[in-house]
Amino acid sequence: MQVIDRLYKDYRPLYPIEEFCPVGQALFIDIETTGLKKETTSLYLIGCGHYTDEGFATKLFFAETGAEEALILSAFDSFACSFTHLFHFNGNKFDIPYLLYKAGLYDMDGFLKDTVQIDIYRLCKPLRYLLFPETMRQKAIEEFLGIGREDKYTGGELIEVYQEYEKRPTDQAFCDLITHNREDVLGMHKIMPILYYLSFKDAPLSYVGYHTNRYSDYTGIEHEEVIFEYRTDISFPRSFTAKTETMYVKASCDDGKILIRLPIHDQEMKIYFDNYRDYCYLPEEDTAILKTLAYSLPKGRYQKATRDTAYQRVSGTFLKQPHSLFKPVLCTDRKDKKKYFRFPEDFNKEAAEEFGRSLINIFFCMKRTSST
């Protein structure tokens, strides 16, 4: 077994760790194994990182062979017991269950007892569709934040490297193995600022204004869109763009400017009346009017309105809205869950900030198949 220590001088927390625990009680951990199935694979490396008065210290417990698995587990347990909170990336799903299973095989009672698990991946998960629509691997977050690596391998690729190392140890293989693990541990320290983006949910926004824009798509068809401008006081490390099928958001970390681009729909909509019993439907005109007005017409001209026929048609230009914020609420059909409002007639500045928040919040409640 080898224990490899390194100090990154003057490294300080990049996010307020105190939100979770005292800084000195936080231990970042990452493990390397010969496979995903804990019952048939072995643990060969446990990496740790923690803050000291001098900086960020890493400590790696490396098993020269599979026979040293119990040794690195025991050494890690003795070291980790000084910390109350373990930080990891998707560790609730893999690292922690794996470690506990292996500790159980060696009758290590009290292994990681009373430690609090802080899964950075779980904390970041609400940002999935705002920032990481393709993948939310740790390396993807590092790339987004502009964090570079010396390591050129994945954990899966290093399995073969370790298996070859067990037979014929080389300095290069050893360096590749520990570099990958150390950079995973160090990377967790570096990606903590990603948590600042969680503040975008229900974020306070200042409405600046809007302007419209016309453009032609690749087929030559002309479209019109509206671009809303907001400002935010939220601090975040990198500018970003996010989009759904019909919305585009651009946020600048330099000045807090947020632009939200929405398509303008030029089509016929319908406004449905909840109090449909107070209306009559006129089939020839395809519209509903109040009973008091209908009764002045010949009986053959009207019929009792139903939920499906108590509507009036509206022509004009419209914007989609996540909630029934701007009235009247319009739709293409009663069963259509999408809501619209007349734009610019029914848009009001007093509700503009709430409108902007509701649009950004869409990214925090999206599901894999959702579209907006």
Regions found by a protein language model. Name each.
Residues 1-29, 34-41, 51-372:
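DEDD superfamily 3′-5′ metal-dependent exonuclease/proofreading module
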Residues 46-48:
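Short beta-strand scaffold segments in enzyme catalytic cores
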